[in-house]
Amino acid sequence: MSSVIERFLRYAAIDTQSNEESQTTPSTGKQLNLARLLEQELKELGLQDARIQEGYVYGTLPANSTKAIPAIGFIAHMDTSPDFSGTDVKAQLVENYDGQDILLNPEHNLVLSPADFPELLDYIGKTLITTDGTTLLGADDKAGIAEIMTAIAYLTAHPEIEHGTICVAFTPDEEIGRGADQFDVAGFGADFAYTVDGGSIGELEYENFNAAKAIVKVKGRNVHPGNAKNKMINSILLANEYIVKLPPQETPATTEGYEGFYHLNDIRGDVEETTLYYIIRDFAEDSFAKRKETMLNLAEECNKKYGSGHFHVEITDQYKNMKEKIQPVMHIVDKAQKAMETVGVKPLIKPIRGGTDGSRLSFMGLPTPNLFTGGHNYHGRYEFIPTFAMEKSVEVILKIIELYAEEHSN
């Protein structure tokens, strides 16, 4: 078993699920279990400044060259999504995949099928890592952590490879949008960085959604149902009216590429009050602004029908499209593309239909595009990752480092 696979399996077994309702940093104490392990492993690899700061793990591999090679950062996040259990992950290796259904869990008859996930057929003959069907896998983003750590281990074992300063960081709470909240850009010390938090092999991303969350509070009036005629106002039914007035063709399930959406991801309520939790996503700034305006205007429209105060919308921006911060330093994307091509990986440059720590870090002065990890179907029981893609990710990281050293050696 290659070292990147061994590392990933160890990291995946540690529960690091984040919690959006917590106000601490990190949002869950269990993320520190992985943080402490990574700090220790970085120190064992010779990164003597390895440290945990505000729940973030930082470390620096000093340059072994006197040339003016830029300091390059590599970043991954420790937490897993709160959308699905990350407790007691039991990863399974499927060797020499034959293109058929994979039985994840005989007891619950859970199957990972190419009929549902046709991308599986791209990996016939390869080794896959899957879940046992009861948890997510955590390749998002423990695969990225394993790939960065393996690359650092390779560099420390091969001091003959010339490189500049290499900065690594592992962040908490990326899955709940707080991964960059306490990130110490100045202390990190990189001129630019890459998050290793993408999907399938070859993905290279420097555009992402503009993102906001919207909380819609709907007020009703509860009265005993036995004498409720012309008195009761059921907030659940009012909330449903709001939901169905948003464009049904503009949801995650009906959009792709550069198309934006409204996503209702939680509802909590009763007759007296119902709360709708939305996320709003779009690539273009004008379209993004229009979506926010649509939600506010819809609340006004509903209030005109039912009376002032029944509907209230609160919108909070979360992150912006990093494209405007990456374009002035496109050499970092070009170098990653060349690195992939050099190691035999076809680059797939595409927009991120989501966000990474890099999107916010780019606006904090650290331009940070995103590299693939190799994983698929994040945030659920059908998550999987081909082992060869993880190995290629390590090669790409090392090649980026090598290319910058070569460029500044001439």
Swiss-Prot record:
Binds 2 Zn(2+) ions per subunit. The keyword Cytoplasm applies. Its EC number is 3.4.11.4. Belongs to the peptidase M20B family. This is Peptidase T. GO terms for cellular component: cytosol. One of its GO terms (biological process) is proteolysis. The keyword Cytoplasm applies. Zn(2+) 1 binds at residues 77, 140, 197. Zn(2+) 2 binds at residues 140, 175, 379. GO terms for molecular function: metallopeptidase activity; tripeptide aminopeptidase activity; zinc ion binding. It comes from the Bacteria. The active site is at residues 79, 174. It is found in: Cytoplasm. Keywords: Aminopeptidase, Cytoplasm, Hydrolase, Metal-binding, Metalloprotease, Protease, Zinc. It comes from Desulfitobacterium hafniense (strain DSM 10664 / DCB-2). Its main location: cytoplasm. It is an enzyme of class 3 (hydrolase). Cleaves the N-terminal amino acid of tripeptides. It catalyses: Release of the N-terminal residue from a tripeptide. Its cofactor is Zn(2+).
